[in-house]
């Protein structure tokens, strides 16, 4: 079983190799992660990943912004270079979820909801997105076929990555006939529970 640290280390090592730089030139590391604490019992990822990569005593920070965590890490890495704090910074995004049950993962993801408003009424993200789709359809006439076209477009883009979690194209029938998660959302309209990293 690959740990959240091992996933991050592999992605970062490959990125450093791909960039063609000596890792000793990296002056900062930012890691974007949302649920390593509740799902893996592991926090303080910045320092641990920096150590695993052998980067020495450099500033290392974990940032969290739910689904935007990796993007936030990338932004901070760019800003540290733009500000002249370092010539090279690395951003890593990582999540490990599949070792936990759907209920445990859902509860962890729900921590991104505002507990004082959304959480009190029992919302989940698929539930909120299902409601948002209904509202969008009411105002703009959004159809099932239009949403399926977006799913297919995203799937096509994902298949360009040989490491993609789901390595096959979906037909419109696959999408429409997948099980209901939160009406009108079906399985393939939703993000899968996954393990992965990028850098």
Place the predicted regions along the sequence by residue.
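N-terminal leader/propeptide and maturation segments of large enzyme subunits in energy/redox metabolism
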Residues: 122-171
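Condensing-enzyme catalytic core mediating Claisen C-C bond formation in acyl metabolism
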Residues: 1-5, 14, 115, 139, ...
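Short, well-ordered amphipathic alpha-helical segments that serve as non-catalytic structural scaffolds
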Residues: 5-20, 45, 49, 73, ...
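Buried hydrophobic positions in well-ordered alpha/beta secondary-structure cores of metabolic enzymes
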Residues: 15, 26-29, 70, 77, ...
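Metallocofactor- and cofactor-centric catalytic cores in central/energy metabolism, strongly enriched
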Residues: 2-9, 25, 30, 36-37, ...
